Amino acid sequence: MSEQKVVICKDLKSELQDFLSSLKYDKLFILMDTNTKEKCFPLVEDIPAFQKAPILVMEAGDMNKGFVSLAQIWTALSNEGASRNSLLVNLGGGMITDMGGFAGATFKRGIRTINIPTTLMASVDAAVGGKTGINFNGLKNEVGSFYPPLCVFIDCDFLRTLDRDNILSGYAEMIKHGLISSMENYASVMLFDIDTMNYSYLNSLVGQSVAVKERIVEEDPKEQGIRKALNFGHTIGHAFESLSFLKMRPILHGHAVAAGIVSELYLSHKLCGFPMEKLSQVVYYIKEYYPALFFDCTDYDTLYELMTHDKKNEGGIINFTLLKNVGDVRINQSVTKEKILESLDFYRESFGI
């Protein structure tokens, strides 16, 4: 898998234009969703390389990250004369960078892509690392590929277009990055007050978070080992997210991950000795900012069944990434159903559900 370049921009338009000018391509396409077109595209639409570029606009929302939308992208690329020498720019949040990346990976067996994330979630997670995919059969990112973009351009000015819920969604991944990396990173993440929104401090945290993911992906690009650290909070988190879709009450990915972090820290404490003091600190922080996820014991079997479809599983065994301490990651941890259900109890008790 080729190495990707990540640029934390000081002047997005100038840096992006310079990069595009250095490339040879026959046609450039821009993929975005309805939200991005309204709030973000006006910030970059006057870039010279974007003039006359066909624009592909998808309906916003993760429920649209499926095969129907993917086929629409393929059809548009085909109808507009895209070739293997074309370039697809994915301007948007995780839904766009995931699906656009997969469209790029598969159209004519692969065309080059560039990611310009416009959400916090995409900036620190979805757009970086080369994972692409779509939801399928009610499961998150069930079909996809490892296909890194040529470059990821991160401009934190886009974050000012986001509402609080979307900031929270992305910040859950930053909490995860703090927990799996170092005490220094963890402490800085825990200090951020989301309600006061110091964008300058947030920008520095974004750079720190991206560096954590870049380091891990460079070491293990195809998730054979340590890259599984990035799945912390996601085994249960993805189950929460999938359950919300089944109930037709979809929640943002990061809100599900935050809940997954709470449950998986409980498992980390019980099975790996993660310190209770730090567990309590993280639970307090997440309770302070994140809405509670409402579910009860009648949902447990469904949640467990959803976990059995997790991509990290091997031989029918649910594999977790757990922590012995901040920065001390234990991958490929098998957990009994009893303990998993206990962790769901712990979440509900912590949030008074």
From Swiss-Prot:
One of its GO terms (cellular component) is cytoplasm. GO terms for biological process: amino acid biosynthetic process; aromatic amino acid family biosynthetic process; chorismate biosynthetic process. Its EC number is 4.2.3.4. Zn(2+) binds at E173, H234, H253. One of its GO terms (molecular function) is 3-dehydroquinate synthase activity. InterPro entries: Dehydroquinate_synthase (IPR050071), DHQ_synth_AroB (IPR016037), DHQ_synth_fam (IPR030963), DHQS/DOIS_N (IPR030960), DHQS_C (IPR056179). Pathway: Metabolic intermediate biosynthesis; chorismate biosynthesis; chorismate from D-erythrose 4-phosphate and phosphoenolpyruvate: step 2/7. It holds the Pfam family DHQ_synthase. It comes from the Bacteria. Binds 1 divalent metal cation per subunit. Can use either Co(2+) or Zn(2+). It catalyses: 7-phospho-2-dehydro-3-deoxy-D-arabino-heptonate = 3-dehydroquinate + phosphate. Disulfide bonds: none annotated. The keyword Nucleotide-binding applies. Keywords: Amino-acid biosynthesis, Aromatic amino acid biosynthesis, Cobalt, Cytoplasm, Lyase, Metal-binding, NAD, Nucleotide-binding, Zinc. It is found in: Cytoplasm. Its cofactor is NAD(+); Co(2+); Zn(2+). NAD(+) binds at residues 60-65, 94-98, 118-119, 131, 140. The keyword Amino-acid biosynthesis applies. Catalyzes the conversion of 3-deoxy-D-arabino-heptulosonate 7-phosphate (DAHP) to dehydroquinate (DHQ). Belongs to the sugar phosphate cyclases superfamily. Dehydroquinate synthase family. This is 3-dehydroquinate synthase. It comes from Parabacteroides distasonis (strain ATCC 8503 / DSM 20701 / CIP 104284 / JCM 5825 / NCTC 11152).
